[in-house]
């Protein structure tokens, strides 16, 4: 495919937007899904004052801006800001003219119908794209792992889902959503560090905590055992240097933080952990396909990046499943971007080319065409 009509792949997450060209093995642009507006108009005089900033630029000017995330728990809640993020994606990050390309977008499982229509409408009417398609994030992650049947545990910044998929199609009745993800774990780690005497309060300091989380946290295979080890020795302690040069020591917080994925009660939530949610999702599926799901549990998203998460998942799921069941957890190293990678693979398949919704079809049928062509 010539560069000029290469499809664009845009994966809009609650925390990060991943964008690039179909056929590439990783996204060209990865930036925070946020829009910032000046708190006071007047301060900004002479700064070539824009009325809004997107992504990294908003992040770096956060001191004088009010920041908003237009995607909450995986679902778009503010369309004006979402449009700004897409505009930024095409024109500033990828530097392409959207009207020259087909665009593959991703959506959360159980995304409301009206939302899919709105996405479709904005793509065709605001950006005049040649063609577009909306794919379910978890399905793309499964494709990226080279499978068409399996259950995906997708956990990002804003939301986690367990999505059983059979022969390439998600089974909506068995999809479960868990409002517990990366942002909650960052908040929880902040609380744990405060107990240790390190206070992180501003939004800028939360970014530091996120970095500590990503660099030092891991999932314990046996939580009680690990707590005992941490109490009696300093072998689990690690140090972290803050931007101002201060060095802090982190101990049992390293595994207490992601433990909340398995024990949401730590956060005061009354929901099931990721192992029970995965099990419950499988149990909502037909008896005949459960074996295939148990042996193809695919982890996806940034909040599945903790070392030790796959072994723990295997242990906890084995405890819930029938005794003879073969369980296999697949944790691809690139799983942080596997939704985007799956989109890149799908959009470059020759068999996919007839699946696009074209401008002509949109003009004939309107936004509801998306329900007929994307499922």
Curated annotation (Swiss-Prot):
Pfam families documented for this protein: Actin
The keyword Transcription appears for this protein: no
GO molecular function: ATP binding; hydrolase activity
InterPro entries found in the cross-reference section: Actin, Actin/actin-like_CS, Actin_CS, ATPase_NBD
Enzyme class: hydrolase
SMART domains: ACTIN
Domain of life assignment: Eukaryota
Keywords assigned by UniProt, alphabetized: ATP-binding, Cytoplasm, Cytoskeleton, Hydrolase, Nucleotide-binding
Catalytic activity: ATP + H2O = ADP + phosphate + H(+)
Cellular localisation: Cytoplasm, Cytoskeleton
UniProt cross-references to PROSITE patterns, sorted A to Z: ACTINS_1, ACTINS_2, ACTINS_ACT_LIKE
EC number: 3.6.4.-
Gene Ontology CC, one term: cytoskeleton
Alphabetized SUPFAM superfamilies for the sequence: Actin-like ATPase domain
Assigned protein family: Belongs to the actin family.
Function field: Actins are highly conserved proteins that are involved in various types of cell motility and are ubiquitously expressed in all eukaryotic cells.
Matches recorded under PANTHER family: ACTIN (PTHR11937)
Protein name, entry field: Actin-1
Species this protein is from: Echinococcus granulosus
Taxonomic lineage from the root: Eukaryota, Metazoa, Spiralia, Lophotrochozoa, Platyhelminthes
């Amino acid at each position: 495919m010539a560069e000029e009509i290469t499809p664009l792949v845009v994966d809009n997450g609650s925390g990060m937007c991943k964008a690039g060209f179909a056929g590439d093995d990783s996204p060209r642009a990865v930036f925070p899904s946020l829009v910032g507006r000046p708190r006071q108009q007047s301060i900004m005089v002479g700064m070539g004052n824009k009325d809004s900033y997107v992504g990294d630029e908003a992040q770096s000017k956060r001191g004088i801006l009010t920041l908003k995330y237009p995607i909450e728990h995986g679902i778009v809640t503010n369309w004006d800001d979402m449009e700004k993020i897409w505009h930024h994606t095409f024109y500033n990050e990828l530097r392409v003219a959207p009207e020259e390309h087909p665009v593959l977008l991703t959506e959360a499982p159980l995304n409301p119908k009206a939302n899919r229509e709105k996405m479709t409408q904005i793509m065709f009417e605001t950006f005049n794209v040649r063609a577009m398609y909306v794919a379910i994030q978890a399905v793309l992650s499964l494709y990226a792992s080279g499978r068409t049947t399996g259950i995906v545990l997708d956990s990002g910044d804003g939301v986690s889902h367990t999505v059983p998929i059979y022969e390439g199609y998600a089974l909506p009745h068995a999809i479960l959503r868990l409002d517990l993800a990366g942002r909650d774990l960052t908040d929880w780690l902040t609380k744990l560090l405060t107990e240790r005497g390190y206070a992180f309060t501003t939004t800028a300091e939360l970014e530091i905590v996120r970095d500590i989380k990503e660099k030092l946290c891991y999932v314990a295979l046996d939580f009680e055992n690990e707590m005992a080890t941490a109490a009696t020795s300093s072998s689990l302690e690690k140090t972290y240097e803050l931007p101002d040069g201060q060095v802090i020591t982190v101990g049992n917080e390293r595994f207490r933080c992601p433990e909340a994925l398995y024990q949401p009660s730590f956060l005061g939530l009354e929901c099931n952990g990721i192992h029970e949610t995965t099990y419950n999702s499988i149990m909502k599926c037909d008896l005949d396909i459960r074996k295939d799901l148990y042996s193809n549990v695919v982890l996806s998203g940034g909040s599945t990046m903790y070392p030790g998460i796959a072994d723990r998942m295997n242990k906890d799921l084995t405890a819930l499943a029938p005794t003879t069941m073969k369980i296999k957890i697949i944790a691809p190293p690139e799983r942080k971007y596997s939704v985007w990678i799956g989109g890149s693979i799908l959009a470059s398949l020759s068999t996919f080319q007839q699946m696009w919704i074209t401008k002509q079809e949109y003009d004939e049928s309107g936004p509801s065409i998306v329900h007929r062509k994307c499922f």
